[in-house]
């Protein structure tokens, strides 16, 4: 059994399992909780989505989001050992390929959960407030991925920031 079969099986198992979808929603909700009182004010943080997102990922509530990222597929080793699926898979293939496949899918699922949860959060705040305010855009222009803000590629900015957090 080659590595591609292990990966296909693990990815299929990930997609058919509901915890990844709960994890995505959990990441978005934990970002809402991270805003604390700012989530319930009229303009949220400075009246724009980028400042609100920046505050949400900078506060301590974001630590809960990492738990939701691990929630989606990190229990796979325990489940495989409990139901004796690990023994069956290793006997059919190779221990090294089995472990590498599981590790790749666990890592990938946590990154995907963080990215999609962050995009869900930003989409929900974007319904209420604009992307930026005129005078407050300079802070993001000097920071990481500032060229994306200058080109008004806000979704790409959020995607790359969430990808970096998920890694």
What are these regions (language model features)?
Residues 1-24:
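Aromatic- and glycine-rich beta-strand/loop motifs that create alpha-glucan
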Residues 10, 14, 89, 166-167:
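Generic transmembrane alpha-helix motif of multi-pass integral membrane proteins
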């Amino acid at each position: 059994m080659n590595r591609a079969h292990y990966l296909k099986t693990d990815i299929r198992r990930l997609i058919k399992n509901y915890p990844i979808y709960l994890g995505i929603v959990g990441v978005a909700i934990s970002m809402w909780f991270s805003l604390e009182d700012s989530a319930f004010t009229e303009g949220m943080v400075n009246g724009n989505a980028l400042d609100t997102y920046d505050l949400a990922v900078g506060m301590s509530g974001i630590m809960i989001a990492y738990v939701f990222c691990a929630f989606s597929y990190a229990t796979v080793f325990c489940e495989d050992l409990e139901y004796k699926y690990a023994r069956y898979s290793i006997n059919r293939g190779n221990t090294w390929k089995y472990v590498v496949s599981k590790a790749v899918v666990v890592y990938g699922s946590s990154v995907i959960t963080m990215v999609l949860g962050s995009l869900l959060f930003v989409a929900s705040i974007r319904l209420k407030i604009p992307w930026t305010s005129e005078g407050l855009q300079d802070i993001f222009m000097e920071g990481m991925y500032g060229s994306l803000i200058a080109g008004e590629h806000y979704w790409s900015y959020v995607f790359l920031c969430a990808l970096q957090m998920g890694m």
